[in-house]
Structure formats: structure tokens, C-alpha cells
């Protein structure tokens, strides 16, 4: 008696979300570092600057990578904030009054899981914590989609300013094995749309 299924479920979900955030933070940090490194490596590599997909003024690939690194840095800051915002736990009984469970249980469990106890939860942890994280995840997905959409455009046969790696033995098409399709970029675009839709 005392602990509700929501006490367990909400607290476990928030713990899982913090662990997922840790993985995402590490991945976004790597993406930012790679883009930053490439920005310096490509700082003198001229390319066509475009607006609305049309040739505009010259720029460098370094500038593109620098722009992406900065965007990932902002995403990293947002993810860290969202992780803090979702790191809550509540083990306070049926309506949040601790009438049948000692507050020490909540404090102990939250401390062990690296969570903060939600000071005014009722039966459930407020969903604004989850919604904020979902919004940040959509923003990170939008960053990824923006980058790979540009990379896909730069890989077109008539442009060919950039291309994905093509492994030995890899086939671009079952009917035309010589093709070098931007498969990774296409997958990232598709997955980012799934994230943004949810």
C-alpha cells in the first residue's frame, strides 16, 4: 500500500528521459565538434553561396560548417536545459499528499536516480516537463534536417560540390549500381520528420 503505479511509472519515465538526454547531449556535442573542426579545415575552400537555391555570392565551406557548429552548440544548450527540466520524480501517493507513504522514500529514490522531487505534483508529474523536451528534440531534428537537406542538394549530379562516403561494395541502386545516392542524408531527413511530427 502507499505507492501508486503512477509514482513508479512517472519517476521511471523521467529517469529514462534523463538517460536518453545524456546520450543525445553526447551525440550533439560530437556533431558540434566535428562541424567546428571542419569549419577550420575548410575555411579557405571556396564554394558557391546560394539564396533560394540560386547562385549568389562566393563563400567558403568553412562558413557553412561554422554555421552548423554554432547551431549544434545552441541545440546542446537547449538539450542540457531540457534534461534538467525533465529530471523530476514523484513518489507521493494517490494525490501527492504523502498520506500513505513517507516523503523520505521519494527523497531517497530521487537522490539515487539523480532526480529532483517534484514539489507540487499531484498524482502525476506535470506534462509540461515532457512537452518542453519534445519541443527541444524537434529543434535538434530540424537542425539535422537543415544540414542534410543542403548536403543532398550539393550531391546532385549537376552540382556535385559534396558527397557522402561510398563504401567499397556499396551499391547506389539495384538497377544502376554505379549511382551514388545520398542514402544517409535521406534517412536523416525522414527520421527528423518523424521526430518533429511526434
Residue locations for each model-derived region?
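Conserved phosphate/anionic-ligand binding catalytic regions in large, soluble enzymes, centered on
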Residues: 2-13, 95, 145-146
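Long, non-coiled-coil amphipathic alpha-helical linker/lever segments
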Residues: 8-56, 116-129
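Short, small-residue-rich loop/turn micro-motifs
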Residues: 3, 39, 43, 113, ...
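Internal glycine-rich alpha/beta core junctions
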Residues: 26-29, 57-198
Amino acid at each position: 500500500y502507499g505507492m501508486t503505479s503512477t509514482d513508479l511509472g512517472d519517476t521511471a519515465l523521467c529517469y529514462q528521459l534523463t538517460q536518453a538526454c545524456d546520450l543525445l547531449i553526447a551525440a550533439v556535442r560530437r556533431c558540434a565538434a566535428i562541424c567546428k573542426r571542419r569549419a577550420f579545415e575548410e575555411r579557405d575552400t571556396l564554394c558557391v553561396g546560394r539564396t533560394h537555391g540560386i547562385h549568389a555570392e562566393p563563400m567558403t565551406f568553412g562558413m557553412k560548417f561554422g554555421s552548423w557548429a554554432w547551431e549544434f552548440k545552441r541545440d546542446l544548450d537547449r538539450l542540457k536545459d531540457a534534461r534538467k527540466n525533465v529530471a523530476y520524480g514523484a513518489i507521493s501517493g494517490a494525490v501527492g499528499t504523502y498520506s500513505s507513504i513517507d516523503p523520505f522514500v521519494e527523497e531517497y529514490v530521487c537522490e539515487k536516480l539523480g532526480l529532483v522531487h517534484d514539489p507540487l505534483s499531484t498524482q502525476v508529474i506535470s506534462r509540461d516537463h515532457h512537452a518542453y523536451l519534445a519541443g527541444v528534440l524537434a529543434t535538434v531534428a530540424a537542425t539535422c534536417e537543415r544540414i542534410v537537406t543542403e548536403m543532398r542538394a550539393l550531391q546532385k549530379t549537376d552540382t556535385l560540390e559534396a558527397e557522402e562516403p561510398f563504401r567499397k561494395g556499396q551499391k547506389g541502386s539495384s538497377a544502376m549500381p554505379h549511382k551514388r545516392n545520398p542514402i544517409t542524408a535521406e534517412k536523416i531527413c525522414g527520421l527528423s520528420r518523424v521526430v518533429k511530427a511526434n
